[in-house]
Amino acid sequence: MASAQNEHDERAGALRVERAIVELRRGRTIDVMDSHGVAVVAAIERLDPDEVSDFVAADGSLSLVLTPERGEALGLVRYPSALEIALPGDTSLESILRLATGMTSIGEEHVEPLRVGQADPRAAAALTLARHAQIIPAFVTRDPAEGRADLLLLQVSIDDIENYPLIRGRELQRVSRARVPLAASENCEFIVYRERFGDAEHVAIVIDTPDSAKPVPV
């Protein structure tokens, strides 16, 4: 019974991640949650300039979350995971995009960070989502209004995000197969699989008739 419940929970989590990926690709804000709180995040790649002001905190700062590699390229201290840069609240979206995509540096952009530090785990998890969504791994983030999650935003947990790669690689559906003679062997078959969770496709090339009792060469 517990095993069936665990499987149900894992699938439900994978669906939440899938929906979060769609939201990010469409430029919508989401909530990333864990037992300690909520981070409201928006991918800068799809962010509307008018929405930037929604992420300016009460102290006038705008928090940008980047990968450690990008931070190092900007000349900042390398952190073990994501870093969070508090920028002046009037920083333009154009400047944010240039900082996040390697087209400039902190000095060249004439932006003086108010604070630089390691991002909290929720904001860091958003970068993992960006990789799954195949978008620029950079987000603006803020605390939720009134300290609680906005029920109008899609909510996904850190556990959902961490478990997603295990689930998406575990369930593959065969969608097509065809015989395709090759120069090395006329007895060859291409089999295409699609992930049940995720949008990646995998191709298996079967040459001749492998002995399933022996290790299959890859």
PLM regions and their residue ranges:
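Catalytic domains of riboflavin
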Residues: 1-218
